[in-house]
């Protein structure tokens, strides 16, 4: 059935006016949609009226159920639609603006039910729709008109439910009187129980000196405070009855049996320097200092609070805390300077009134050079006379002729130039692969204030040296100063060899540095007393070198065949002579 070119105005649906567009041909689905919308509109109008004179009253006889409409097919102009309504009804419901898949589970009173089962007694309102706005039309893939309709002869039932917001979760009301603090967490102070979550006790009076404050810690669910009391005890817990190993007390407190001496003085806190830095307690006053110590809980992992009470007590009992193990971290090179050690010992430094400026410092400006500063004396080139390579090599050869070089060594001094340092590090790597060598780590030199001794001091020293050892030992010439020592920025390294072979081998690696950087690198030979080697493991190699020069080689070269044959003939001739 095709409609005309212009669609006429529908009196039941005034929102749709005449359109000049050519409408699409009506399908059974669109016809069923129009039929359902008409039925729903009447029902909505009947519910909205509710005796209101602004809405027209509808007689109950004009309202018919879906079953009555299907039976009265002759009066219904859409009887051709009702004949195959069983297959199209679900699609018409979607086109009518109702999507059953998007609706949530709601009560039955808020649903629209359409059933083909016969009713015993017709009711005036068999279709109930609330005034909830209907969702937009949607077509799911299962209800698409392109799919083949399902064949069924059974009576069907379609339940259409409008969307409603999800029901909130009802929680039981909790009265304020029912909220009580946990009974496991209590604080006892002066034989009184205080129902609070935590307590900070600061005593300044002599009457409260030596009194005991106990805090019974709660389980993991109880809140932890920033401060605590001298004793923290956990309540009875089912897990605490298990045979667990005793946990160490982080504060070193005694057990509950010996709680009489829990409040002790800090007179024995000097056993550990690290502990004395953290707790500074006065011996004359009776003040107790509170400090927070957070630890791990026994089973729940909750942080426990404790209070450290420090004060003088007449009983004399004292409980020492645990000694904290000092760190074995290797200090930096700057922390090992003499200047830093003197500052740690509170050595006073004189602060000269000089003008600090960049540039070279004259020799007579001693106070400016040794002012109290952390900067080093910087040198682009080495500030002393550098010997030549021939002098260094000649000194090494003289030492090697004696066959013992345990009193000789090689000293390398170089500036902190990046290029120089890279070359020196490469030589250090090669020296590390050689045998019988003792290498030092590059170190700095610190310098003190220069002073010129008067002639009488020089005379006393010379006389003591001429008299002998006893006079030199008794000589006390200590001249001190109050200026700050300064370190130079050039590095020093010492190489000690066990045999002349190793001394010359190390020197052959170091002399090219001196040749490449004549003003930044210096190599020289120094002498020591007969103190031996850096380790006694090199003594065997040194003795073997000295003995090896006087021993004959163990392997003799093989004799020629001619010489061997002549020897055999000579031996035969000797035997003949003896036989005669």
Swiss-Prot record:
Any one Gene Ontology molecular-function term assigned to this protein's record: DNA binding
Chain positions found as Phosphoserine: 203, 205
Renumbered residue ranges of the record's region Disordered: 1-30, 99-161, 206-335
Residue ranges annotated as motif SUMO-interacting motif 1/SIM3: 501-504
Subcellular location: Host nucleus
Main location: host cell
Extent of Basic and acidic residues compositional bias: 1-11
Keywords: Activator, DNA-binding, Early protein, G0/G1 host cell cycle checkpoint dysregulation by virus, G1/S host cell cycle checkpoint dysregulation by virus, Host nucleus, Host-virus interaction, Isopeptide bond, Metal-binding, Modulation of host cell cycle by virus, Phosphoprotein, Transcription, Transcription regulation, Ubl conjugation
Pfam families: Herpes_IE1, Herpes_IE2_3
Numbered residues of crosslink Glycyl lysine isopeptide (Lys-Gly) (interchain with G-Cter in SUMO): 175, 180
Cellular-component GO terms for this entry: host cell nucleus
Short sequence motif SUMO-interacting motif 1/SIM2: positions: 410-413
Motif (SUMO-interacting motif 1/SIM1): 199-202
Biased composition (Polar residues): 99-133
GO BP annotations, alphabetical order: bidirectional double-stranded viral DNA replication; DNA-templated viral transcription; regulation of DNA-templated transcription; symbiont-mediated perturbation of host cell cycle G0/G1 transition checkpoint; symbiont-mediated perturbation of host cell cycle G1/S transition checkpoint
Described purpose of this protein according to its UniProt entry: Stimulates viral early and late gene expression and thus play a crucial role in the regulation of productive infection. Selectively drives host RNA Pol II transcription initiation at a subset of viral early-late and late promoters without substantially affecting Pol II transcription of expressed host genes. Mechanistically, forms a repressive complex at the major immediate-early promoter region involving direct association with host nucleosomes and TBP. Concerning activation, stimulates transcription by binding nearby, but not within, core promoter regions.
Binding partners and assembly: Interacts with host SUMO-modified form of TATA-binding protein (TBP)-associated factor 12/TAF12 in a SIM-dependent manner; this interaction increases the transactivation activity of IE2. Interacts with host CHAF1A. Interacts with several components of the host transcriptional machinery including TBP, TF2B and CREB1. Interacts with host DNA replication licensing factor MCM3. Interacts with host PLSCR1; this interaction inhibits IE2 transactivating activity.
Domain remark in the UniProt entry: The SUMO-interacting motif (SIM) is required for efficient transactivation function.
Protein name, UniProt field: Viral transcription factor IE2
């Amino acid at each position: 059935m095709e409609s005309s070119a212009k669609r006429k105005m529908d009196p039941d649906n005034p929102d749709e006016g005449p359109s000049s567009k050519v409408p699409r041909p009506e399908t059974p689905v669109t016809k069923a949609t129009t039929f359902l919308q008409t039925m729903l509109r009447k029902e909505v109008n009947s519910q909205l009226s509710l005796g209101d004179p602004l809405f027209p009253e509808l007689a109950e006889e004009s309202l018919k159920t879906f079953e009555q409409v299907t039976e009265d097919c002759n009066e219904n102009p859409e009887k051709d639609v009702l004949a195959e309504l069983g297959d199209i009804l679900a699609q018409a419901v979607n086109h009518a603006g109702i999507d059953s898949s998007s609706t949530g589970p709601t009560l039955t009173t808020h649903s629209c039910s359409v059933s083909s089962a016969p009713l015993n007694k017709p009711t005036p309102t068999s279709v109930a729709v609330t005034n909830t706005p209907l969702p937009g039309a949607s077509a799911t893939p299962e209800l698409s008109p392109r799919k083949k309709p399902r064949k069924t002869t059974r009576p069907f039932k379609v339940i259409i439910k409008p969307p409603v917001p999800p029901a909130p979760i009802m929680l039981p009301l909790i009265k304020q009187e029912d909220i009580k603090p946990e009974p496991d967490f209590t604080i006892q102070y002066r034989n009184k129980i205080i129902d609070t979550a935590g307590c900070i006790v600061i005593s300044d009076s002599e009457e409260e000196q030596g009194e005991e404050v106990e805090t019974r810690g709660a389980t993991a669910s109880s809140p932890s405070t920033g401060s605590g009391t001298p004793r923290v005890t956990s309540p009875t817990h089912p897990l605490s009855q298990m045979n667990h190993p005793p946990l160490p007390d982080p504060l070193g407190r005694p057990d509950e049996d010996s709680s009489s001496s829990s409040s002790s003085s800090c007179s024995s806190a000097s056993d550990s320097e690290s502990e004395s830095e953290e707790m500074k307690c006065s011996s004359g006053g009776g003040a107790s200092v509170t400090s927070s110590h957070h630890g791990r809980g026994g089973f729940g992992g909750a942080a426990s609070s404790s209070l450290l009470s420090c004060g003088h007590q007449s009983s004399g009992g004292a409980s020492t805390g645990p000694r904290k193990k000092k760190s074995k971290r290797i200090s930096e090179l700057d922390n090992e300077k003499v200047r830093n050690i003197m500052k740690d010992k509170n050595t006073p430094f004189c602060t000269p009134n000089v003008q600090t400026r960049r540039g070279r410092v004259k020799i007579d400006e001693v106070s400016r050079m040794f002012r109290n500063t952390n900067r080093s004396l910087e040198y682009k080139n080495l500030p002393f006379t550098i010997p030549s390579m021939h002098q260094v090599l000649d000194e090494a050869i003289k030492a090697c002729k004696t066959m013992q070089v345990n009193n000789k060594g090689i000293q390398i001094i170089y500036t902190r130039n990046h290029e120089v340092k890279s070359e020196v590090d490469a030589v250090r790597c090669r020296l590390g692969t050689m045998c019988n060598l003792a290498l030092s780590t590059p170190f700095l030199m610190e310098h003190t204030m220069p002073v010129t001794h008067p002639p009488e001091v020089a005379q006393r020293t010379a006389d003591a040296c001429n008299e002998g050892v006893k006079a030199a030992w008794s000589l006390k010439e200590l001249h001190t100063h109050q200026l700050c020592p300064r370190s130079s920025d050039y590095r020093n390294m010492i190489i000690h060899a066990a045999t002349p072979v190793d001394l010359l081998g190390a020197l052959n690696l170091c002399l090219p540095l001196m040749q490449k950087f004549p003003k930044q690198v210096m190599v020289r030979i120094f002498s020591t007393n007969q103190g031996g080697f850096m380790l006694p493991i090199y003594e065997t190699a040194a003795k073997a070198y000295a003995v090896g020069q006087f021993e004959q080689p163990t392997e003799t070269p093989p004799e020629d065949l001619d010489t061997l044959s002549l020897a055999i003939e000579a031996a035969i001739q000797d035997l003949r002579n003896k036989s005669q």
